[in-house]
A protein has these predicted regions:
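Conserved N-terminal beta1-alpha1 strand-loop-helix module at the mouth
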Residues: 1-217
């Protein structure tokens, strides 16, 4: 079970998430209350263990800007959370071996997500970042060929049920482990990760289990 803590805005929360067992941390570069500057993210990512996957979240950004910001920030993976086309997504994937394409649960393109040329699919609520749940059975519409990351309204209390019902490859949380704006709650982070992994059939095994070439240029 791959667990990503998203919406990281400071070094303390990044280190906390790693210490609690997170496999990845996400930084939002799209306009948002959780938006962070590339230089600040770089200062954080260089303090993290190399096995931790650092993910930059973008929305409707031109591919050249995504690539530029990602390199400045020192992140290893890209998450596209907007209306990016298959061609745009593939262009970005030409520079980053691990690109996650996010889809809202009501997106009519979900059954054809494999056209975007990524290995990873993140399934979110219709209003990303709202903290609201959606009908998990919709996950059945996602292509079987893709690794599914479930997001949207997950909390320490419901993530176990979500993992048992959907059997995703991974889970993603932001507001569900929030203490206050811009800060994570240590106990919520700990319980979320523990509950997600406790209900998983398979445990995530680090970079041996992800399609990422760390020397890829």
């Amino acid at each position: 079970m791959f667990v990503k803590i998203c919406g990281i805005t400071n070094e303390d929360d990044a280190l906390l998430s790693v210490a609690m067992g997170a496999d990845a941390v996400g930084f939002v570069f799209a306009p948002s209350t959780r938006q962070v500057a590339p230089q600040k993210v770089y200062d954080i990512t260089r303090r993290l263990p190399p096995e931790i996957l650092t993910v930059g979240v973008f929305r409707n950004e031109h591919p050249s800007r995504v690539i530029e910001i990602a390199h400045k920030a020192g992140i290893k993976a890209i998450q596209l959370h907007g209306r990016e086309t298959p061609d745009q997504t593939k262009e970005i994937a030409g520079h980053f071996r691990w690109v996650i394409k996010a889809f809202a649960s009501d997106d009519e393109n979900l059954p054809n997500a494999d056209r975007y040329g990524t290995d990873m699919l993140l399934l979110d609520a219709p209003s990303p970042g709202s903290g609201k749940l959606f009908d998990w059975s919709i996950a059945g519409d996602a292509p079987d060929s893709m690794k599914l990351i479930l997001a949207g309204g997950l909390t320490p209390e419901n993530v176990g049920n979500a993992v048992e019902e959907v059997r995703p490859w991974g889970v993603d949380v932001a507001s569900g482990v929030k203490k206050e704006p811009g800060r994570k709650d240590p106990m919520k982070v700990k319980r979320f990760i523990e509950n997600a992994k406790a209900h998983a059939i398979e445990q995530y095994r680090g970079d041996d289990n992800i399609p990422y070439d760390w020397d890829f240029e």
